[in-house]
């Protein structure tokens, strides 16, 4: 039964698409809290984020240092009040800055200070990703593993990142669509990059990626 559901969910990708429909959604104001944090701070923020309501989401990227984004969408007075109660906790991290935007399109991602884009036309890259549930009490172990992975990264173009998918993905919505729903909170990924045509560096980088993921 599960296999059949998965096939039905994948059907649009196997078919010839002749028509599509677009539906717009209401654009709401967004508060963004962002900045560099250390690993201990990341651990605390991840623990808090697993209690976030569905209108708040944490994303982070670990390149040379850890940079986080927290997005909070403001929809109604009651939701806004609850949202601010969660965000008050973040006042204890002085390096984080707050910005307010009228809509999502105004937001700029990944500041130049991250120095991510040593990546260029002369680089090739590979990404590996997977969905995962709440870490809960395993957050300290996750942070320890993350630090070990980054200690071994082969060059400055490689990084690890994760996106919090949102509250609704924690719920099993069996039968709500033809897609197979999984209880998921986090979408971590590893980005690996190497110089074009440098097979030796490619092997080192890919070995790092596979070892990190295993």
Residue ranges and their predicted role:
Residues 1-214:
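Soluble FAD-dependent oxygen oxidases
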